[in-house]
């Protein structure tokens, strides 16, 4: 018979789900007579209310090969057993918003992602239910090896027109907040508003669960099913911090020229907010200049879009050539022709057209109605935000969902005709605040994301989008059918907008933690984008190091002519490309359940993989972050001091990347420290103590050691040690054991370093013998730029 579901009449321990993973212990979820959720017989949520129900997943796991046992059902030799289950509840009253206790969480370490702003999430840890934050999007309970308890994931999802998040309840209860976003949309019975999943691997845990949810909902595609836009391989420049709303064609041109002249030509350019035609409701929509003169912080929020065409600053562009085109189309064409490195130009727009939406009753624009945003109880618990205050005060000109396609087509068709390659779609999670009269948040989101997806497929090759201000499960579960690149952290704040002078430093640690931990969840849907930074900021190198190994695009928002070219050249190649990792960076296991911002002892450690080596980044981010009492980010200077951690080759998830690396049989790794410029040989289980001052870093290239069987020569490529992601330069690697020959395909230029236990007889680059240095078992050879990103073939003969 089928595995039993939990109901309010359950009188014995019901096994909901079991899974056998190879030689690993059998994993099972059950509910005992005392109403406790158990994993392998050990409670993780206790005193579960009688109205909580569960159902098993209906399809075999796409990941695991299960073995039959007494709790499973065989069907044509395939079991229907799963390592997870869906959770629901019954109530007697149909409402638009339910807060439902799920069970008590006590004494188990957890890591979570919660919304601290309407549109941004971050990391939070604790051990008891009352320590949870409102608007929690994902909750992972730590495993206990001695008890045999695996990692447990609690993932709030969507059911019909309702969306779920987690929050703290009374007496350490974990509560589910299940809401429709409209008082007209009510419900009383839910079968699958939350998903529980088990795994002994925290990275597979989330990936597997997302696959199950995808099968259940059918409303999104995972990242591995999509192709991110080509800008992820490039260095870029964004106009935001350089100009804010005062961006203009001459400034964009001068910005690209300054970077190009300095040897760091951008491969893509983002023209941020400030190019559109907008106005306040009391401005004359014909002149439009009044709206464009509102450039102080917050002044643009009440403005609304009044035409698809660019504003007068870009519309009046002309290059002086009688035969040249004017306006945005002429500017983009001239920019790409003059600066050949620029392959893509993106522009910014809000999901609703502009911050204040679309202005009603404007000729040439779709119908729009000013809607007063309504904040849910969970959103009211987020951080105070000037943008939200201004938008609530002035309302949003919402284009009805049946006309969203017309709006996106209008914006995007004009941009496509002007030579624009993609869009940064911002202010995405404003939509949930506008859903009262439009069928609720889920239905309104479905309509808008369907229209956006259709337009992107039509005008921008299906993937020419950067999603921003999108941090909520509505977006990830409904809006990622085509979108494959998105921001995973709050904005880069060069200083604290609240005026704390120390924010110049501690906010940078916050940003890094946002991006690293959010990627654990978001990276299953979109390729993580760690946002821009400025190369002259006091923490610029700190930022650059994290971006270089993030696996995503790397771009800056430098003011025109104000650049640190020495730093830029540590991650930008002369053709505007970058040395990108194969995967996206994630926190290491030993800091998943720790607080790298304000416990004074935890180092943020992130791992990634290149083709032939791993990379481990160590960052001291301690010094400030979310404060539950004041419900805002604030300084915690008492924790801003030197931090010590242990680093090991084991910290790298060799089998969890996009292209897993087989290290079976590898006994020793050559580990190169970028800042210390030293190399150590380490066994996989070796641990090295590293201490870092506040807002400083170290990058470790971890390269498996190869041994020539003929002469027992040890060899490991490090890469270009002048580049932050040194190992990313090694693009091909071939060992000829019989000839004692190594061939390395190197991308980029600078100093190539390799470890070799013996001095090579000779070294050749593209068939020509070259000089090299050999000291302390390190071979160093200079690689010249070949004129493009084609590989230089470097040969070492022993």
Swiss-Prot record:
Inhibited by 1-deoxygalactonojirimycin. Not inhibited by stachyose. Strong inhibition of the hydrolytic activity by sucrose. Keywords: Carbohydrate metabolism, Glycosyltransferase, Transferase. InterPro entries: Aldolase_TIM, Glycoside_hydrolase_SF, Glycosyl_hydrolases_36. Its EC number is 2.4.1.82. Belongs to the glycosyl hydrolases 36 family. Transglycosidase operating by a ping-pong reaction mechanism. Involved in the synthesis of raffinose, a major soluble carbohydrate in seeds, roots and tubers. Able to utilize D-ononitol and D-pinitol as acceptors. May also act as a glycoside hydrolase. This is Galactinol--sucrose galactosyltransferase. It is an enzyme of class 2 (transferase). It catalyses: alpha-D-galactosyl-(1->3)-1D-myo-inositol + sucrose = raffinose + myo-inositol. One of its GO terms (molecular function) is galactinol-sucrose galactosyltransferase activity. The lineage of its organism: Eukaryota, Viridiplantae, Streptophyta, Embryophyta, Tracheophyta. Optimum pH is 7.0. Gene3D superfamilies: Aldolase class I. It comes from Pisum sativum (Garden pea). Pfam families: Raffinose_syn.
């Amino acid at each position: 018979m089928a595995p039993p579901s939990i109901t309010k009449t359950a009188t014995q321990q019901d096994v909901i789900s079991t899974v056998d993973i190879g030689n690993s212990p059998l994993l099972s979820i059950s509910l005992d007579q005392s109403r406790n959720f158990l994993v392998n017989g050990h409670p993780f949520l206790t005193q579960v209310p009688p109205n909580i129900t569960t159902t098993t997943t209906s399809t075999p796991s796409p990941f695991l090969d299960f073995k039959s046992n007494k709790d499973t059902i065989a069907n044509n030799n395939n079991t229907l057993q799963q390592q997870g289950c869906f959770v629901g509840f019954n109530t007697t009253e149909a409402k638009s918003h339910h807060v439902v206790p799920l069970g008590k969480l006590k004494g188990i370490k957890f890591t979570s992602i919660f919304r601290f702003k309407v549109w941004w999430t971050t990391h939070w840890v604790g051990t008891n239910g009352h320590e949870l934050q409102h608007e929690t999007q994902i909750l992972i309970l730590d495993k206990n090896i001695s008890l045999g308890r695996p990692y447990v994931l609690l993932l709030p999802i969507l059911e019909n027109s309702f969306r779920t998040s987690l929050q703290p309840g009374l007496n350490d209860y974990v509560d589910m907040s299940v809401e429709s976003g409209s008082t007209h949309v009510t419900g009383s019975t839910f079968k699958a508003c939350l998903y529980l999943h088990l795994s002994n691997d925290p990275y597979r845990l989330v990936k597997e669960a997302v696959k199950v949810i995808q099968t259940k909902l059918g409303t999104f595609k995972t990242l591995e099913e999509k192709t991110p836009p080509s800008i992820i391989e490039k260095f870029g420049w964004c106009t935001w911090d350089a100009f804010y709303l005062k961006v203009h064609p001459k400034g964009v041109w001068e910005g690209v020229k300054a970077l190009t002249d300095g040897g760091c030509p951008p491969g893509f350019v983002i023209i941020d907010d400030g190019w559109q035609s907008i106005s306040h409701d009391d401005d004359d929509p014909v002149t439009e200049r009044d709206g464009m003169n509102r450039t102080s912080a917050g002044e643009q929020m009440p403005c609304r879009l009044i035409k698809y065409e660019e504003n007068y600053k870009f519309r009046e562009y002309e290059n002086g050539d009688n035969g040249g085109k004017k306006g945005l189309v002429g500017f983009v064409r001239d920019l790409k022709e003059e600066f050949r490195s620029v392959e893509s130009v993106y522009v910014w727009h809000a999901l609703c057209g502009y911050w204040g939406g679309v202005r009603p009753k404007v000729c040439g624009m779709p119908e729009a109605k000013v809607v007063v945003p309504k904040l849910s109880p969970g959103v009211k618990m987020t951080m105070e935000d000037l943008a939200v205050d201004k938008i609530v005060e002035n309302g949003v000109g919402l284009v009805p969902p049946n006309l969203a396609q017309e709006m996106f087509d209008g914006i995007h068709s004009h941009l496509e005709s002007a030579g624009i390659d993609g869009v940064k779609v911002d202010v995405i999670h404003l939509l949930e605040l506008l859903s009262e009269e439009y069928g609720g948040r889920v239905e309104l989101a479905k309509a808008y994301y369907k229209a956006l997806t259709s337009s992107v497929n039509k005008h921008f090759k299906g993937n020419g989008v950067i999603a921003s201000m999108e941090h909520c499960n509505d977006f990830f579960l409904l809006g990622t059918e085509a979108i494959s690149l998105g921001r995973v952290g709050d904005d880069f704040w060069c200083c604290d907008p609240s005026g704390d002078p120390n924010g110049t430093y501690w906010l940078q640690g916050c940003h890094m933690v946002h991006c690293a931990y959010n990627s654990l969840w978001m990276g299953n849907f979109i390729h993580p984008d760690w946002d821009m930074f400025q190369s002259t900021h006091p923490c610029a190198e700190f930022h650059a190091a994290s971006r270089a190994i993030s696996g995503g695009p790397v771009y800056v928002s430098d003011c025109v002519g104000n650049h640190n070219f020495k730093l830029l050249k540590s991650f930008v190649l002369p053709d505007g490309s970058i040395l990108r990792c194969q995967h996206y960076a994630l926190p290491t296991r030993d800091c998943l359940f720790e607080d790298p911002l304000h416990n004074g002892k935890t180092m943020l450690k992130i791992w990634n993989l290149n083709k032939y080596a791993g990379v481990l980044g160590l960052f001291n981010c301690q010094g400030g972050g979310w404060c539950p009492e004041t419900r805002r980010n604030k300084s915690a200077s008492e924790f801003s001091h030197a931090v010590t951690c242990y680093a090991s080759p084991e910290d790298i998830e060799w089998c969890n990347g996009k292209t897993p690396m087989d290290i079976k049989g590898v006994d020793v790794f050559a580990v190169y420290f970028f800042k210390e410029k030293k190399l150590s040989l380490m066994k996989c289980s070796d641990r090295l103590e590293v201490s870092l001052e506040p807002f400083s870093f170290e990058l470790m290239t971890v390269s498996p050691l190869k041994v020539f069987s003929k002469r027992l020569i040890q060899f490991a490529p490090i890469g270009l040690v002048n580049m932050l992601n040194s190992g990313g330069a090694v693009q091909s690697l071939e060992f000829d054991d019989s000839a004692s020959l190594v061939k390395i395909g190197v991308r980029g230029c600078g100093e190539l370093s390799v470890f070799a236990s013996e001095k090579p007889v000779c070294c050749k680059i593209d068939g020509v013998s070259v000089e090299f240095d050999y000291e302390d078992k390190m071979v160093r050879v200079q690689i010249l730029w070949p004129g493009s990103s084609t590989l230089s073939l470097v040969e070492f003969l022993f």
